[in-house]
Amino acid sequence: MRVSWETVTRPPKHPFRISRTTGHEAGAERVWVHIECDGVEGWGEADPNSYYGESARTVIAALEQMRSVVEAARGPEALESIERDIERAVNHSRSARAAVSTALHDLVGKRAGLPLWKMWGLSPAEAPQSSFTIGLDEPDVLRRKVEEAAGYPILKVKLGTDRDEEVLRIIRQGAGDKVLRVDANAAWEAEEALEKIAMLADFGVEFVEQPLPPDDRDGYRFLHGKSALPVIVDESCVDSSDIPGLVGLAHGINIKLAKCGGPREGLRMIHTARSCGLQVMIGCMLESTLGIAPAAHLASLVDYADLDGAALLATDPFVGPGLQGAEIRVGDGPGLGVERA
């Protein structure tokens, strides 16, 4: 096998603001990974996020370390052992590992002539609808974003400032009776969160994501018994090893393949969460269709989906599995089923 990569820039349609940043702090620069074997090529995307200490530079450094491990393998089919060897060689840059894992799965599927969902024995028709994310912005821009999301029955609203009630009121007025979900990106403290969540419930919000800092276990324990809404954690749950410790602290987890290390670990997280009685959401970074596709193949296993990353980009250079409106579609193309646009 031969491993190569390229660095590209794909900015969002709008500056993507959340509570801990101003402007689009990550995701514009990404790395596309190619793994070739016997004339067949698998693709993957690394979307590094500075919140996790990653950048295109750290991804490339990790890929340099991974290259020899992958190229020493006889073929891509021994996924478990290859990924185990990669993790031993590189215990950082999960987005780089996710890109390599995705490219390997794509390669195996193409060589077998099967889409990933068939390799995993899944039923794509069971996938939930995806939400569409509304980032923090000024009132007139918020109204325009809600109009742009007309085809989406579920909106995910970013909060975490002193304007939370104003933002939610504007979006509820524009969205009518659509389902609203809220992501605070760890902006609140426990007592504040309890009050904010009561306000969210008054606006008919379905659940709240990551209300507290990732390591505030006492705060999550406090909220778990008092919150008016279910609590889903994102930043508090990086990979499957975090999940058992979240029982009694949260009602569910948000899996992102760029955060956990790829589709193989994502699948492990889903099964671990189910065994712990937790709900499962699958999300994404601001990824192109290439980055979204493996999550789309897994989506039939989850309760909630937020796979709108490619829809938030100014341009998407790929076509394939992802969203058709709010519906998650994967098709029968081999591997990821992704092609250049």
Regions found by a protein language model. Name each.
Residues 1-180, 185-194, 198-202, 226, ...:
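N-terminal capping/lid subdomain adjacent to the active-site entrance of alpha/beta enzymes
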Residues 108-111, 297-301:
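Alpha-helix C-terminal capping segments
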Residues 157, 162-284, 288-299, 314-326:
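Catalytic core of soluble alpha/beta enzymes
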Residues 303-306:
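Short helix/strand-capping turn motifs
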Residues 308-312:
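Mobile, glycine-enriched helix-loop/loop "lid" segments at the mouths of ligand-binding/catalytic clefts
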